[in-house]
UniProtKB/Swiss-Prot annotation:
GO terms for biological process: threonine biosynthetic process. Its main location: cytoplasm. One of its GO terms (molecular function) is ATP binding. Pathway: Amino-acid biosynthesis; L-threonine biosynthesis; L-threonine from L-aspartate: step 4/5. It comes from Buchnera aphidicola subsp. Schizaphis graminum (strain Sg). This is Homoserine kinase. GO terms for cellular component: cytoplasm. Belongs to the GHMP kinase family. Homoserine kinase subfamily.
Length: 309
């Protein structure tokens, strides 16, 4: 029996639409992600547990975990019956890589129980393919950080899919999920099919600045460059009073703020714990829409997916 944990992630990181993603972990040690337990069995079995298990499809063949198992068996050309327990601790449609958590944890667990027939690159390609079926297009900005850890730059080259880039260890990432759902597929549909040249140049300039600042350890420059000209102008309307929240938490002292993935989770960054705590409190009191919403002060999770049992 193998138990695997895959962490939540912040896709896009503001400036890097479909290009950047960071795995995160609350600084209090809480595991923010999904867990999957797998053991060999006589037939395929799936049990759903966890806080958000009631949001999963009743039909097991519509469950992401079943799709992962089915695709894995197809790739290795063997039918391996397994018993799987999914602990669904990530809210669906939260903008924190919920589906990626399940995909990464499941594929790594099945691969390990089968003595690793797929290598790291093959697994990552399969993760991206399954994510694409869920969201409408193949993208790695959640699965790559959840799998590999750290802050990932998505290249999608035939030989190199993703590369880890330096992150600022003194940064606190405050993430707030308001307790409502935003469909990734719908959030993608709202974006324009084409962008003006000046917007593309501006976004490229800031993305290049962020990468440069990350490697040269200029944290303030990196924070200034974390601006989203591609998705935020359109997706902000899907979030509860996002622009007001962004203005307020920047006044409190956030050095950056943006939409996590497709939303509705937002992230803010502070380089001081006291400021992070003030931002966290404001978000709890003003951004959460119901009792299921949450706020966490996080750091970048450099480990990524891991065996915990």
């Amino acid at each position: 029996m193998i138990k695997i944990y895959a962490p939540a992630s912040v896709a896009n990181v503001g400036v890097g639409f479909d290009i950047l993603g960071a795995a995160i972990i609350p600084i209090n040690g809480t595991l923010l992600g999904d867990c999957v337990t797998v053991k060999l069995s006589k037939k395929f079995e799936l049990i759903n547990k966890g806080i958000f298990s009631n949001k999963l499809p009743i039909n097991k063949e519509q469950n992401i975990v079943w799709k992962c198992w089915f695709k894995f068996c197809k790739v290795i050309k063997k039918n391996i019956p397994v018993s799987i327990i999914l602990e669904k601790n990530m809210p669906i449609g939260s903008g924190l890589g919920s589906s990626a958590c399940s995909v990464v944890a499941t594929l790594v667990a099945i691969n390990q129980i089968c003595n690793n027939p797929l290598n790291s690159k093959e697994l990552l390609l399969l993760m991206g393919e399954i994510e694409g079926e869920i969201s409408g297009s193949i993208h790695y900005d959640n699965v790559a950080p959840s799998y590999l850890g750290g802050l990932q730059l998505i290249l999608e080259d035939s030989d190199i899919i993703s590369q880890k880039i330096p992150n600022f260890k003194h940064w606190f990432w405050i993430i707030a999920w308001p307790g409502i759902k935003v469909s990734t597929a719908e959030a993608r549909k709202i974006l324009p099919k084409e962008y003006k040249k000046d917007i593309c140049i501006k976004n490229s300039r800031y993305l290049a600045g962020f990468i440069h600042a990350s490697y040269t350890k200029q944290s303030h420059l990196a924070a200034r460059c974390m601006q989203d000209f591609i998705a935020e102008p359109y997706r902000s309307k899907l979030l509860p009073n996002f622009l007001n929240a962004k203005e307020k938490i920047k006044k409190i002292g956030a050095i950056s703020c943006g939409i996590s993935g497709s939303g509705p989770t937002i992230f803010a960054i502070s380089d001081k714990i006291k400021t992070a705590e003030k931002i966290s409190l404001w978000l709890k009191n003003n951004y959460l829409q119901n009792k299921t919403g949450f706020v966490h002060i996080c750091a970048v999770d450099v480990k990524g997916v891991r065996k915990i049992g």
